[in-house]
UniProtKB/Swiss-Prot annotation:
InterPro entries the record matches: DEAD/DEAH_box_helicase_dom, Hel308-like_dom4, Hel308_SKI2-like, Helicase_ATP-bd, Helicase_C-like, Helicase_Hel308, P-loop_NTPase, WH_DNA-bd_sf
Domain Helicase C-terminal: from-to ranges: 234-434
Gene expressing this chain: hel308
UniProt subunit comment: Monomer.
Protein species of origin: Natronomonas pharaonis (strain ATCC 35678 / DSM 2160 / CIP 103997 / JCM 8858 / NBRC 14720 / NCIMB 2260 / Gabara) (Halobacterium pharaonis)
Family annotation (PROSITE patterns): HELICASE_ATP_BIND_1, HELICASE_CTER
Pfam families named among the record's database cross-references: DEAD (PF00270), Helicase_C (PF00271), Helicase_dom4_arc (PF21280), HHH_5 (PF14520)
Name of the protein in its database record: ATP-dependent DNA helicase Hel308
């Protein structure tokens, strides 16, 4: 189908596609048009990676906008939100406006009301619905990207319930669900009352196989010689041959440590294939990476990148990941070793994909478990870049002939599993039942069950034990919510209490709220450590794991600081509870170290974490402490100012005396300390400061000093003709604090 044949979209869209080099639609895209995606029909598109799902979404959104409507694009990851924002920004030259929102859960997003396309994570959309964002009622089209992730036990229920709420608010809403190839696409379409495009078509061939011995064994029975040299491992041999052919490789492993170890080893292979220009460009990129943060993770990543390899996992900062992804797309980095999160939608195609580890540790199973077919196929789908590669190859690695047969059966020849709803788990139900009642979607038990009838769970288990199980979980959850004061019940009728409304607005798990309220009940003046440990033990915080030898250290710390901890310390004989308490204490001490201005690299080394982990814990703690502040104020529980101070300290990573300074835009934790040591102790001091002193404290960086002074409200922030104060400069040099590197808290 020629792009000019598509009706219902703005006249300029066909010209735009031609400028992008697109003259005709892929078969799945044409099938979507035939199914009415540009005429307002709901659609489930279950097609492989790189088969044009985004264009299907654009057809739906632009046709809705052309009819005077608004479109919402839901993504599973913040990184994907940024990527989609950049893609859709191309439409701004045609008069459309695009907004992205992934931040505060208390924000109603009123500023988005005049946007044509809104990009948001499912959690953010859920919070906007809870908080009554007025533009939600006016949506005409919603696109749910990576909708197969409703199968994820942590994030899936939020997407599932959010789609049910959006369809309840607007019964005529067009829903376009973009999915990987799954085993029950028809059931997904039934849930959403949608047309179905279910296709295995790809723009270039994907050859799936297993490497064993000295050859690749493909699913069609053919073999390709790929010898492993005496000093090599199979992964290195695959990467080496791919480089020789001018291609790039994604290597998927099962842990962060394995990702880093594999990247360091493969860097010895990739470096031999670099030319002089690539070496120079990679050297510059490595310096950018080192400037992101002063941690061992940053240094290790930069060392790998200089040699043409990289690792990618959640412990890396978002800046690290973006730099690596961009350089890989530009074919500068030749190999990325990643954990499976990279397979979840971020656009990083490669000539070859190697699934090195097809098992990973499962705490629930108590050991190593095989990955699902769906997850492995998602990784494999990254192989082959349309327009760049003649084909894509996805390879698993076998150590024996028996394992070769097993991998062919389990992954190469297998169809992906059906997607299954995880809504009926009690942690999900706690949050979503309270939100459903508090936001007015149900005012009785029967109305709740009626609302839940619009979910995927109801579609899958409408008859038999599943329906009975849903009612049991609902009743258990309602009992918990009533016992803890979040709802009132009168017969069948249900109403959220003031506390319930607050908890829903704050986007807290009710169990987190109950833990915080209980901890603050007898805490007149809580310390920062006590507050950090309190929020760290809530279900909304993924606390740090206890490593070998940690139990003794943190048991001693628990008894030493027991007076500060909020709530009753469990007995050591309560094995599970005591371990959880110690894990929360370890997390709290990391937050305390951060708020005490310990260097980021020291924190990373002490706790065995990366900059991305630190940022994640800091952001979560800031949110939970903000929620604790609101709960304490509304419930008259504890000294709100103490909670506020602990929140601001963890937000900026500073001691109490630096909170005011660190709040100035562009200052951050290290610059605040330098200014303070130079005698500038408050925002008011900075507003009236001698510019030469500020310039010296900020290491002579004129633009930085000018920006900081302007943010503080200085009357004349310009640095023309200003020289650094010699006494301050000499003092700073003696202190030896000029590391010249950025830090999580610098900006």
């Amino acid at each position: 189908m020629d792009v000019s044949e598509v009706s219902g979209v703005p006249p300029w869209f066909a010209d735009h596609l031609r400028e992008e080099g697109i003259e005709s639609l892929y078969p799945p895209q044409a099938a979507a048009v035939d199914a009415g995606v540009a005429d307002g029909e709901s659609l489930v598109a279950s097609v492989p990676t790189a088969s044009g799902k985004t264009l299907v979404a654009q057809l739906a959104m632009l046709s809705a906008i052309d009819r005077g409507g608004t479109a919402l694009y839901i993504v599973p990851l913040r990184a994907l939100a940024s990527e989609k924002r950049e893609e859709f920004a191309a439409f701004e030259e045609y008069g459309l406006s695009v907004g992205v929102t992934t931040g505060s859960y208390e924000d109603t997003g009123e500023w988005l009301a005049d946007k044509d396309i809104i990009v948001a994570t499912s959690e953010k959309v859920d919070s906007l619905v809870r908080n009554g964002a007025p533009w939600i009622d006016d949506l005409d089209c919603v696109v749910a990207d990576e909708v197969h992730l409703v199968d994820d036990e942590h994030r899936g229920p939020t997407l599932e319930v959010t789609l049910a709420k959006l369809r309840r608010v607007n019964p005529n809403l067009q829903v376009v669900a973009l999915s990987a190839t799954v085993g029950n696409a028809g059931e997904m379409a039934e849930w959403l009352d949608a047309e179905l495009v279910d296709s295995s078509w790809r723009p270039i061939e994907l050859r799936k196989g297993v490497h064993y011995g000295q050859a690749l064994h493909f699913g069609d029975g053919t073999q390709q010689e790929l010898p492993v040299q005496r000093t090599e491992k199979p992964t290195e041999a695959v990467v080496r041959e791919t480089l020789d052919e001018g291609g790039s490789t994604l290597v998927f492993v099962n842990s962060r440590r394995n990702a880093e170890g594999a990247a360091k080893r493969l860097a010895k292979t990739t470096v031999d294939g670099l030319d002089a220009d690539e070496r120079a460009a990679l050297s510059s990129l490595a310096e950018e990476i080192r400037a992101v943060s002063d941690t061992e993770t940053s240094d290790d990543l930069a060392d790998c990148v200089e040699q043409g390899a990289a690792f990618h996992h959640a412990g890396c900062s978002s800046e690290h990941r973006s730099l690596v992804e961009d350089a890989f797309r530009d074919r500068l980095i030749k190999t990325i070793c990643a954990t499976p999160t990279l397979a979840a939608g971020v656009n990083t195609p490669a000539r070859r994909v190697v699934v090195r580890d097809w098992r990973r540790y499962s705490g629930d199973a108590g050991g190593m478990q095989p990955l699902s077919v769906l997850e492995v196929h998602q990784m494999m789908g990254r192989a082959g870049r349309p327009g760049r590669d003649p084909y894509g190859e996805a390879v698993l690695l076998a150590d024996s002939h028996d394992e070769l047969d097993e991998l062919l059966d389990r992954y190469v020849w297998a169809d992906p599993e059906p997607v299954e709803s995880k809504l009926a788990r009690e942690p999900s139900m706690r949050t979503h039942l309270l939100a459903t009642v508090a936001s007015g979607f149900a005012d009785s038990r029967s109305a709740l069950l009626s609302f839940l009838d619009r979910t995927l769970y109801a579609t899958q288990y409408r008859h038999g034990d599943g329906e009975d199980n849903l009612e049991r979980v609902v009743d258990t959850t309602l009992s918990y919510l009533e016992t803890n004061g979040f709802i009132d019940r009168d017969g069948d009728a249900i109403e959220a209490t003031d506390l319930g409304h607050t908890v829903s607005r704050l986007y807290l798990d009710p169990m987190s709220a109950a833990e915080i309220i209980d901890g603050l009940a007898d805490a007149a003046s809580p310390t920062a450590m006590g507050l950090y440990q309190l929020v760290a033990r809530t279900p909304d915080m993924y606390e740090l794991y206890l490593r070998s030898g940690d139990r003794e250290e943190y048991t001693m710390l628990a008894y030493e600081r027991e007076a500060e901890l909020l709530g009753e310390l469990p007995s050591e004989f309560e094995e599970g509870r005591f371990e959880d308490w110690l894990s929360a204490l370890k997390t709290a001490r990391m937050l305390e170290d951060w708020a005490s201005e310990l260097d980021e690299d020291d924190i990373a080394e002490r706790y065995g974490v990366g900059p991305g982990d630190i940022r994640g814990k800091v952001d979560t703690a800031e949110w939970l402490l903000g929620a604790a502040e609101s709960l304490a104020s509304e419930q008259d529980l504890a000294d709100v100012s103490a909670i506020r101070e602990a929140r601001k300290r963890v937000e900026h990573g500073v001691g109490e005396e630096l909170i005011d300074l660190a709040g100035v835009r562009g200052v951050g934790r290290k610059r605040a300390r330098r200014l303070y040591d130079a005698g500038i102790e408050t925002r008011a001091d900075l507003r009236n400061a001698d510019k030469s002193v500020v310039l010296a404290a900020l290491r002579g960086r004129e633009q930085t000093a000018e920006n900081v002074l302007e943010a503080a409200g200085h009357q004349q922030p310009e640095m023309d003709g200003v020289t650094p104060d010699a006494d301050v400069k000499e003092s700073a040099a003696a202190a030896g604090t000029d590391d010249g590197q950025a830090n999580l808290g610098d900006f």
